[in-house]
Amino acid sequence: MNQDKHPEITDEEQELITVEELSQKLELLYKDMEQIRRENLLFEAYLARNRKEIAKEDEVSEDKKGKGKKKDKNVDKKSLLLTNEEKFEIAQQEQDALKKQIDDGRIKSDQILETLRAILEETDMAITEIRKDAFDFQREILVGGENSRTGKIEAEKIIKFFEEKERQKDALIAKYSSKRTNLERQILKTNNQIQKKEEMGDDLKFIDFYQLQIENKKYVKEIDDKNKKLLALKISTNRISQTLKDEKQNLKQELDKGKEYASQMSERKKKISKIDAQIKSVKKVTSKLEKDRKIYDKQKEIFVQDNQDDVPQIMKYVQYKSKEQQLLYAIQNLERKIEIAELAYKKANRILQSSQQFQQK
């Protein structure tokens, strides 16, 4: 009969419809289970937070029951269920508790952040102080404390430097001690005022609170201005440190160049002294040859005078001519060497003078 009434729906379509309905019901069940799970978590948190109060209420209720245990068995299960108003109240209490925890956590995190900022600021100040001390030590001891005669650092300057630093530290300690004493006095005075107001029951009036707000804004503005100045000083210090580093590098390069020029000058001086020795040696040889030439010229004149009337022998004449040619050739070679040595000497003198001028600059 059903097939006659609904001929268009087959058995397979009917099964598909049934499966779809079951899937929808299952999805609704999952949603209900998720809601119940969240409610249970909320109630567990409420019980954990109010466990002591609930235990006291249970003890009081058990004392009141007394002999009515049989009646309790017949209590309707509906009385054990929470109403929507009770659920709302529990949820509201848990929300307030969670909000309070968040506020407390925010306050603690702000306190920790302020502490970390103070530590960071103190660390930056310490780093700046260390850099300044290192710069002063390098300027006054490593550079200015070197003895020009021995090339070593004088111990007296080191002792004087550290004594001066110790005096500065003592003065700083005294300054901070005085500041700490003043702050302790102010804290003690403020605590006494607060205690007096608490004893008198005098609360802060609106105008006092407004005045405190104005002062707080003023101090916050001053702190911001000082922080900006401190940041600018830090940037300037970093820039100066970088410039100093670059200048040190340039100074090192110039010193290396100076050492190289000094080495070149030493080598050139050695060459000049060697050339001077060669020139002296050549001059001695030249002088000797000149003497020999003069002697030869005299001998030649004597020979010519003695043999003006005689015919000279051919072999002696050839020997004299050969010896004369050798002497002339030796003289020419020596004169050429003298010219070369003089040119080298002049060149070396020019190089030495230019090196001395560069060293004076």
Swiss-Prot record:
Primary location class: other
Phenotypic consequence of gene deletion: Mutants swimming speed is reduced compared to wild-type with trajectories wavy and kinky. Cilia length is not affected.
Pfam families hit by this protein: CCDC113_CCDC96_CC
Any single Gene Ontology cellular-component annotation: axoneme
Keyword hit for Secreted: no
Any single biological process term in GO: cilium assembly
InterPro entries for the chain: CC_domain-Cilium_Assoc, CCDC113/CCDC96_CC
Superkingdom of this protein's organism: Eukaryota
Locations listed in the record: Cell projection, Cilium
Keyword list, A-Z: Cell projection, Cilium biogenesis/degradation, Coiled coil
Family to which this protein belongs: Belongs to the CFAP263 family.
Job description of the protein: In complex with CFAP263, acts as a regulator of ciliary beating that connects radial spoke 3 (RS3) to the inner dynein arm (IDA) and the nexin-dynein regulatory complex (N-DRC). The complex is positioned parallel to N-DRC and forms a connection between the arch at the base of RS3, the IDA tail and N-DRC.
Subunit structure as annotated in this protein's UniProt entry: Forms a complex with CFAP184; the interaction is required for functional activity in cilia.
Descriptive protein name: Cilia- and flagella-associated protein 263
Organism, as annotated: Tetrahymena thermophila (strain SB210)
